[in-house]
């Protein structure tokens, strides 16, 4: 009996969820000084990195040709789906933590730790790799003199390590960590400055491309490409066409355009850093959704414009994969423009570096404040900055940039990001179908009047909710549910979302590794494909039939459950495409994370060790007021359910920094 009780207690620890209250939402130990413009600049700077100067040429030459503009459109639509899910959670739970926090309040502690631990890896590798890229780009402008010096005197001949230690990258990371520790307001100004320069350079590229471009480069004939291949003595492709495709706007067909879209999807990664600023924004419920959606729109316009200008200036088959824009300007005899491009590239790398470094200490801070990581990381400076987490993040990233060859580790960034996207989309589905009780809004809320009609309707239906929650599960409640969500319908949706993720995983594996069997029309593959598709559609339609919570927040994802479900499909499919070596490295990282969680985090979690407010104030500026000594497990669950459904709206609030 005792072992069973211990196992049950252990299982409850893994699925316990974070309690978020109105009191904890309005208070913050961090400096509330960021505006909507700051968030847009942060999102654009983080997302619109140096990839815009390189990725367009690489994808256009190898996959899409001139139809790269369509590839970016498809990738942008897929990214917007994830962005909208982040935007809703940013409006519901405007606290520091991003996907880690959203997972914690919805599906439990273990998944939250997995999400946060992977985000830490993604941001560390991102910061280190961008720092080395900045160092390498600057070295190129100096004719590689810095690299030659370190190769001569500090060469490292060890497997897995870099060719030489990058002292310049270390200085860059530590300088940025110092800037972030000094204050978020100053960091925001630096980011806006470099982002503005980057945007101006990209506008110059677009205008120059459209002026010097030629529409004929989008209409190259297949015969012309065959002649070029023959003159270069290059063998034709398997289908008899040129190795450069069939010409025209889609030389590699629509499959090539889709392949390019899968690569272009990663160009929109980075907007999630906006979601980590919930406690540093003056009006988070409005600023975070606007910042995410606007930054993605600006980035799409930039990628679309640059790729169009590039393929108009120069035939796609002549594009240089490493430096497409400088080579294209030389092709149209505007050689001096390459210096403008180099300046823009350095500015883009600077904003991308800040965009990778900015959210990392905030994830560490949020996890440490909740007790899942070492609590010294939750210390806040007098300038209201998470100084301990920032300096720790800077040191770790600097060591990575100093010693390691990060090319083999970059794919691991994708796992953390795609997993976070998938979980946030799943959490939106689960949260929107939870039953909710109505609580009085804070009397200082200026937006309260806009929500009163919904609130009154919910109050009138409170007795009906109580009656419905007593019903048991049956097929009738499955296909003909009540008008209001109940605990049974919420549990059903939670199960169906998990089952849908499992089905999508199976479908992705089948279409990735069994595509040849499907092409040969083998019976087993077609049967599995049909089964997965039918079950996915049935699950989504069943979720759609369930009643949603009618309470409103400042932003809500449209087209539920179809949009989040499609976002989960895209993210899981891209995760399946990653190599086995990447998953092995990921397993090692997760083993280290589980060691920390089960040795430290599970015992020090605030949700498992409730304290009163004064204790939390002393414990490294922890401002969570939800946990009180007298709450029982049932009270915590009821409190969690009702708080998640509240339309959290705070007034614009600033603090002295």
From Swiss-Prot:
User: What keywords were assigned to this record?
Assistant: Amino-acid transport, Cell membrane, Glycoprotein, Membrane, Phosphoprotein, Transmembrane, Transmembrane helix, Transport
Q: Which residues are glycosylated?
A: 157, 227, 239
What is this protein's tissue specificity according to the annotation? Detected in liver (at protein level). Highest expression in liver and T-cells. Also expressed in brain and lung.
Identify the residue ranges that face the Cytoplasmic compartment according to the record. 1-37, 85-104, 185-192, 270-289, 361-385, 431-489, 549-556, 603-657
Task: Provide any one GO MF term from the record.
Answer: L-lysine transmembrane transporter activity
Q: Which residues lie on this side of the membrane: Extracellular?
A: 60-63, 126-163, 214-248, 310-339, 407-409, 511-523, 578-581
Please describe the post-translational modifications of this protein. N-glycosylated.
| Designated name of the protein | Cationic amino acid transporter 2
**Gene behind this chain?**
Slc7a2
